[in-house]
Amino acid sequence: MGMRMMFTVFLLVVLATTVVPITLASATDGRNAAANARVSPVISKSSKKWCHPNPYTVG
């Protein structure tokens, strides 16, 4: 294998490893946003009910 061919293979490997995590991250962000939109009202209601407004104060 020549130097040019090895460099091309190296670039392809680098591009493949950077493109796949970016596409996976954007796909999971969409799913997480949809799930968080549904769950956040429930969490906010329960946190108001059970959590003290300022946990660092006594009383």
From Swiss-Prot:
GO CC annotations, alphabetized: extracellular region
Compartments where located: Secreted
The keyword Phosphoprotein is annotated on this UniProt entry: no
Disulfide topology: none
Misc remark: The mature peptide contains only 1 cysteine residue.
Family per record: Belongs to the conotoxin A superfamily.
Functional note: Acts as a neurotoxin.
The name this protein goes by in its record: Putative conotoxin
Source organism of this protein record: Conus imperialis (Imperial cone)
Lineage of origin: Eukaryota, Metazoa, Spiralia, Lophotrochozoa, Mollusca
